[in-house]
Amino acid sequence: MKKIRLDTAELEYNIFQSINKEYRTGDNQTENNIVLIHGGIIANANIPLVTFSDILTKNYNILHYHRRGYGKSINKKNDHISILQHVEDCREIMDFLNIKRAHIVGHSIGGTIALQLASIYPDCVKSLILLEPAITGYNEFTNEGVIREFQPIIQMYDKGQRKEAIDIFMKAAIGTNYKELIANILPPNSFELAVVDAKTFFHEEITSMKSWTFTKTQAKDSVHVPVLHIRGIQKTRKISEEREELLRYWLPQTVTRSISNAPHMLQISNTKEVVYLIKLFFQEDNTL
């Protein structure tokens, strides 16, 4: 992966060029760009959206980067990494690569970052695709509940049982067959990388999720682009339904598509369905 140096960070990234030469990045910049913002723990979780097939790379250049504290992306700040800092990082790497406008695909906390990006820098966002977005700061009760779910895993991780803690996380977020899925569709050593990167999520990003706030006024005033929300449906997970209702309240233009029996990291477990829904979203909205 290549690297970009910012004032307080170094971020590694890859550009997957469109197989259609007409849409490739270069001096004649196009708007056929997709930016992938990953969620917590697994930095390469969005990679299957690119490598599964050429459905998206037929007509789009795709930027994939590792956020601060993931992989070899270095955070040089001493304090917690806020959602706003992640937004600025995304904007800077887009500027560096001369990406004026893009479809922003964010998973989990990456969806939170994508939503905030669209609010602060609406001109650089062509559409939002939110995969199981971790929008927690809107409701103190729900927020504390989500954070509380992680506490046993964090305690296990901090006691040195790191692989065991990530094993529990993976089974919940992907499924009991996560090892097979990761081995087949993610880059080598993705589990080992997740064991290391989890420290960033547990001790930096959960804090930033807890303090993040967003309102309908912010959404109404700034976010007018088409929005696709993709969520999994599981009987034991009601929070996805709650977030669907919230997104519709904030952003009435939101189109929600559900995938039955899909876990939180549905871009890994249900790659085919997710890619198809994104493709369909682009096709159905003539403005895209």
Please annotate each region the language model reported.
Residues 84-102:
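Conserved acidic catalytic loop of the alpha/beta-hydrolase fold
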Residues 104-106, 131:
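Short beta-strand immediately N-terminal to the catalytic nucleophile in serine-hydrolase-like folds
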Residues 115-119, 124-158:
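Flexible "cap/lid" loop of the alpha/beta hydrolase fold
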Residues 161-203:
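Conserved alpha/beta-hydrolase catalytic His-Asp/Glu region
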Residues 8-75, 93:
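Conserved HGGG/HGGXW glycine-rich cap/lid loop of the alpha/beta-hydrolase fold
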Residues 106, 110, 114:
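Gly/Ala-rich beta-loop-alpha elbow adjacent to hydrolase catalytic centers
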Residues 259-271:
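Catalytic histidine-centered segment of alpha/beta-hydrolase-like enzymes
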Residues 191-249, 255-258:
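Conserved serine/cysteine hydrolase catalytic core
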